[in-house]
A protein has these predicted regions:
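Amphipathic, charged-and-aliphatic alpha-helical interface segments
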Residues: 57-61, 82-101, 122-133
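Conserved small/polar residues in nucleotide/adenosyl-binding loops
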Residues: 135-137
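Structure-specific DNA junction-binding interface
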Residues: 1-76
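ATP/adenylate-binding site constellation spanning eukaryotic-like Ser/Thr protein kinases
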Residues: 14, 22, 67, 94, ...
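Anionic-ligand binding region
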Residues: 104-115, 122-126
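Residue-level recognition of specific faces of alpha-helices
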Residues: 1, 70-76, 85-88, 100, ...
C-alpha cells in the first residue's frame, strides 16, 4: 500500500500514534519501542504495514525497517496475527527476538500478552532460519 508516513506526531496513546501528513491524521498502531522514540509536535517517519480486512483498515507503524521486517516475518508464522506480532515487538526488540529464536528461548517470547508456550515454540521453529538476515546483531 504505502511504505512509510512522514509527518508531525499529533497524538500518542497506548500503542497508537497519529501522524499528520498533509492535513490528514493517520492512526498507526505501534510498539512501545517506537512510541518511546516519538515526540508530540515533532516530525517523524514511520515505516508502515497496512492490514486490510472486510470490516477494517489498520495501519501499523514502526520507527525502523528492522522492526517492520520482523513484524512481517512474525505475520508469516501460523497463528500469529497483527495483534500478537505487535505484542511481541512491544516487549522485545528485533535483536532480542532474533536472539530468543536462535537460542530457543520461548520464555522471552511468552512475555508478550496473548502469546503462550505453544505459539512461542512455533515462532522459534518457523523463524529460526529467517530472522538472522533481517537485523545486524
Amino acid at each position: 500500500m504505502f511504505y512509510y508516513l512522514n509527518g508531525t506526531i499529533t497524538l500518542l496513546d497506548a500503542n497508537l500514534a497519529v501522524v499528520d501528513c498533509g492535513g490528514v491524521g493517520y492512526a498507526c498502531h505501534t510498539t512501545n519501542y517506537t512510541l518511546a522514540r516519538l515526540q508530540l509536535g515533532k516530525s517523524a517517519k514511520l515505516f508502515t504495514y497496512c492490514n486490510i480486512k472486510e470490516d477494517a483498515f489498520d495501519i501499523f507503524g514502526f520507527s525502523t525497517r528492522e522492526e517492520l521486517n520482523c513484524f512481517e516475518r512474525l505475520l508469516g508464522v501460523t497463528g500469529v496475527g497483527p495483534k500478537a506480532a505487535l505484542a511481541i515487538l512491544s516487549v522485545v526488540s528485533p535483536e532480542q527476538l532474533t536472539l530468543a529464536v536462535m537460542t530457543q528461548d520461548d520464555k522471552t517470547i511468552t512475555m508478550a500478552q496473548g502469546v503462550g508456550k505453544k505459539l512461542a515454540q512455533r515462532i522459534i521453529l518457523e523463524l529460526k532460519d529467517k530472522l538472522l538476515s533481517l537485523i545486524h546483531i
